[in-house]
Amino acid sequence: MPSALVRMFAALCFIVCLGGPYSGAGQGVAPVVQPVDGVTTLLRALQQAAAAGDRTALLALGDAQISRPSFEDFAATVTTPPPTRVVVTERDRAPRDAGVLRLVVEIFTERGIEGRLGTWRIDARPGNTPSDPWRIASVSRLSVVTGLYRLALDTATEYDINNLVVRAPDLTIDVPSGRAFLASTPDGPTAMVLIGRGRMTFSPPDVAERIQVHILSGRDELVEEIDLAFLRFSPYQFGALIDKNALKTRTVDSSDVRTAVGVFNELAPRSLQVDLSDISRDRWSLSPGFADVIAELRTKRFGTITYARSSSEPEDINVFDRKRRRNISIYTSAAKLAQRGRFYSEDERLDYDVLAYDIDAQFMPDRSAIDGNARLKIKILEDGTSSLTLKLAETVAIRGVYSPDFGRLLHLRVVGQNSIIVNLPEVLASGTELWLDVRYTGPVVPQAFDREAIQIAQGPPAQDQRIEIPLQSRYLYSNRSYWYPQSTVTDYATATIRVTVPADFDAIATGQPVESPTLPPGGGDNQRRRKTFVFEASRPVRYLAVIVSRFNRLDNARIPAGSSDVSLYIQSTPRAPVRIRETTERTAGILAFYASLLGDAPYPSFTLAMAESDRPGGHSPPYFAVLNQLLPGSTIVWRNDPVNFENFPSFFLAHELAHQWWGQAIGWKNYHEQWLSEAFAQYFAVLYAEKDREGSLPGILRQMRRTALEASSDGPIYLGYRLGHIQGDDRIFRAVVYNKGAMVLHMLRRLIGEDAFFGGMRAFYQQWKFKKAGTDDFRQVMERAAGRNLERFFAMWVFGSDIPRIKFTSHLSATEATVRFEQLGTVVDAPVTVTITYESGTVESVVVPLTEKQTEQTIPLKGRVRTITANADNAALVEIER
């Protein structure tokens, strides 16, 4: 079985549907139906010979000129040892020279409880006369899936449990007494049902993970009573995982059998299950990888909790609640952490890289449907690659996957995961480049503004009133909707996008508009007439996005942005309240300011779409941004969100524009690193506020510090999207990743100085532009800029969640003030402002860098002192005690 498929099935516990490759999405897709003809008769004869294990009869189907070695190998594969059942399914046919038809055929063979699915390319040649039978002229294997098992519980053998203890990394299952049943493959037991009262103990070593467990359960360990368990494991691990002395055979009890079979039938299909419904009615599954374990544990408080150890995953321990779609704990085991270290990139496991996209998509807004044709230029990264996994919305039907080099290709649907696996007809070497053409059609639900945008959507509004005026419909297809076939992770590539919409709609997409929208000549119903927009992304982008709505083109401008200019376009929905000149000037000013800090703008054009809405927010894909505009008369007020800065209304705009640099030009290596996008965009909005409106910084810092302190106990910045995930409260995510992250950058700036900070930020941007970075990459750049080690700073503020407590005292003499700081806990690096207010009303601020257990500094005085305070400017994430 290809390694990509093993990782897909075994590591991620997916349920897949091996449906017809050209017939559409969904489970149990019917195979291509061909008329009864000479080819059909040939395939029936092939199936009969294979099912009978008759190698001689199968070889008799070959043409006289066929390559005997390859044909004999094929015959041996499907007949030896004799199968118990064979299904031959034609998937595609295409004409070749001299009347030859090239067939794509799947052959499924069962031998006992083991199954094998092979995909073969067969050239069939007609006989010399119409009455002569067709013959096999050549045969070659395209792909094979082995290790399929028709698992069933062994109800003939029941075991008494006597103090059974099952251990997996950071998990212990104790069952003092009860009943057990096994399900086995020829290699040994691979599944177990445990019936009886016991206890599960999940104890993650990582502090951040223990915090998440505490949020769920009220304690740092998840210790829960259970009454049944279902386990999956490698047959080769059974002896190490299960103490056989704890299992004693006993007389089978029919009541226990009914219970165990019910548990097995309910829980076994949840993992490693393969749906072959169009060729077999049986349930087929794969075995877990060596050292992998899946445990479904039914608890009293939380229902069924799933533990999965998937050794091929970068974070190989996962505990989650399937029913509520809630991740409880995801982290790297101690063994893997010792081998690899903390940092990793999601790209490390990729078999290929997408270099370019060419998308032609027709949108039907009234049905939220897409008819698309996507071409992908792909470069193979790993030797031996025989399949490619792509992301694409599960709701669409795939009309076909093609390659100019290989013709029509088979694909496998991954149910529930918005994924397809494309089988290649041969193993490809690293460095090979090819084009894929994916044709698809069907509904795709538009994407809601998500956590990557500043969406004020949590908590009750101050006044619960509704706006009765209907809002202009808008349909956003971006990084979460999988509206086009793409890599399994965000992946930098260039792109050309052609978007066709009804004549009364407009479109904005990733890329520079290259021509005015075209409209077919003639009149008629606007819903039937359509127009096409074309966009060119000449510089690499992480993902592609489209928004379809009714837009008015308001303004455009050319902006100097560092080493190059940017074409700016302003558009809005019809009723969005927009001050055109002010919006253009402010947007241009923000873009130019950011470019002055970092050296350039990443993309040659930018479109700002202003959309009417009942709440603030926005979304910023490459090349454009959508910014919500509150309709006049709206009485809904969202004051309790951490990122709602009412005294600086341009903050949303500044944040979204900053994403063109942070989040788009520079991406993040994995979800832990999302602060490199959100916190950086947030802090650049702070920098713009500091420049644009004198006196705005203290209020912004005060709100950021307050909300960061309130939410810090929920976990560190490095936890990413999982902050607030268990509680279902996105405000926690925004308070920590947005606000605390921005505060960390502000503290870093004050710790290392202006020149080092801004020089380091520019160097980081220029070095990592159009690549994905991590916290360690950022730290190393800033260390070079500052000329000092910053490991402790990042360990505390990015990877830690504690808030330091610092005791502050001061002593005044006639000419100087002596200030002393004592860190009451672990020593951290923190710059703290000492504010001296003189009786004259003059205020002096001095930044004192704290890097030791005790810090003392003498400050010359300029007059009689009224007060002396520490951290009055709220610029440090510390608690000051007097």
Task: Enumerate the language-model features and the residues they cover.
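A surface-exposed beta-strand-loop module
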Residues: G147-V165, P169-D256, T385-L388, A393-G459, ...
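Non-catalytic accessory/interaction domains
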Residues: F290, R298-A338, F343, R349, ...
